[in-house]
Amino acid sequence: MSIANIDALTRVIDHREIFHDEMLALMRRIMSGEMSPVMIAAFAIGLRVKKETIGEIAAAAQVMREFATPVAVPDKTNLVDLCGTGGDGVHTFNISTASMFVAAAAGARVAKHGGRSVSSSSGSADVLEALGAHINLTPEQVAISLERCGIGFMFAPNHHASMKHAAPVRKELGVRTIFNILGPLTNPALAPNQVMGVFHPDLVGIQVRVLQRLGSSHVLIVHGMNGMDEISLSGETMIGELKAGQISEYVVHPADFGLPVYDTRVLKVANKEESVTCIQRALANEDGPVRDIVLLNAGAALYAADVVTSITDGVRAAREAVASGQALAKLSQYVAVTQSFKTAV
């Protein structure tokens, strides 16, 4: 079933839901350049005001996956993505990027999907380049990197070329729309397991149900009660978990994992150079909040990847990976593997 653009706009203005097949058709028009920038903007804002439903988000994500340039990873065992929606306004160092090296060192296979900074001090791509990695890889090279060192970083612009039609609109609007929450739902390697941070507590229940519809296996959607799109060390974190088809929602606290409470301000950075320093300190096992928040989020990734059976066990495994030097070695290995593609050209 198709729906005219103006009919769809009228429906969202009237606070009525766009049906699944209609949303598929509308999103395909956006991704193929068949919808004007004015209509894209109006539709995105209309959805925002109405509040996007689980069905609408799932349909839009399905189309983004359909148009994405994929990374072929036939074996999905222990394959996990660590990412966030961004936009939390907290400006911490790149916690999920640091956690990626720890999780990989402890046995997870990490297919991380990310880009350059939009709202933070630095994006995962910016920081990985500053650490010495080569990020502009082909899908085949990403798959080889994943096979060789347990990490495959997918630079978002290389995999979502069709977003070029919506990107200028999104940038000019300057407010959150459905496009802000679609990126983390569209991993090009189709990682079945995921730790996703979200900028608003309402998104915890929404995103976990979207990923349930999209067929994910083991997912943790997290929102720190201080506003962080990570599992927080400053207090409670809301978690929506999808496991074996079932959803549970609960709250965790650093003390649950034997970790102290810290003020979030000690994790803030102003630029990518400061973020790189924090990552290096964490991987070098420097005691303190920078290391501890990486242990916590890497532990969650190990749990989502089904390497361990609880976040507590994940934190323990992450601690061992850092203390033994394996996490720091994983960073060096990843940089060497990605640079080998650059020199091979």
Curated annotation (Swiss-Prot):
Gene3D superfamilies assigned to the protein according to its UniProt record, in alphabetical order: Nucleoside phosphorylase/phosphoribosyltransferase catalytic domain, Transferase, Pyrimidine Nucleoside Phosphorylase, Chain C
GO CC aspect terms: cytosol
EC number(s) from the headed UniProt entry: 2.4.2.18
Catalytic activity: N-(5-phospho-beta-D-ribosyl)anthranilate + diphosphate = 5-phospho-alpha-D-ribose 1-diphosphate + anthranilate
List of residues binding Mg(2+) 2: D229, E230
Enzyme class: transferase
Cofactor: how and how many bound: Binds 2 magnesium ions per monomer.
GO biological process: L-tryptophan biosynthetic process
Pathway assigned in UniProt: Amino-acid biosynthesis; L-tryptophan biosynthesis; L-tryptophan from chorismate: step 2/5
Binding of anthranilate 1, residues: G84
Entry keyword annotation includes Metal-binding: yes
The keyword Iron appears for this protein: no
Binding site for Mg(2+) 1: S96, E230
Residues annotated as transmembrane: none
GO MF annotations, alphabetized: anthranilate phosphoribosyltransferase activity; magnesium ion binding
Coiled-coil regions listed in the entry: none
Keyword set, alphabetical order: Amino-acid biosynthesis, Aromatic amino acid biosynthesis, Glycosyltransferase, Magnesium, Metal-binding, Transferase, Tryptophan biosynthesis
Binding sites annotated in the UniProt record for 5-phospho-alpha-D-ribose 1-diphosphate: 84, 87-88, 92, 94-97, 112-120, 124
One Pfam family it belongs to: Glycos_trans_3N
Cofactor(s) in the UniProt record: Mg(2+)
Assembly description: Homodimer.
Chain's role: Catalyzes the transfer of the phosphoribosyl group of 5-phosphorylribose-1-pyrophosphate (PRPP) to anthranilate to yield N-(5'-phosphoribosyl)-anthranilate (PRA).
Family: Belongs to the anthranilate phosphoribosyltransferase family.
Protein name: Anthranilate phosphoribosyltransferase
Gene that produces this protein: trpD
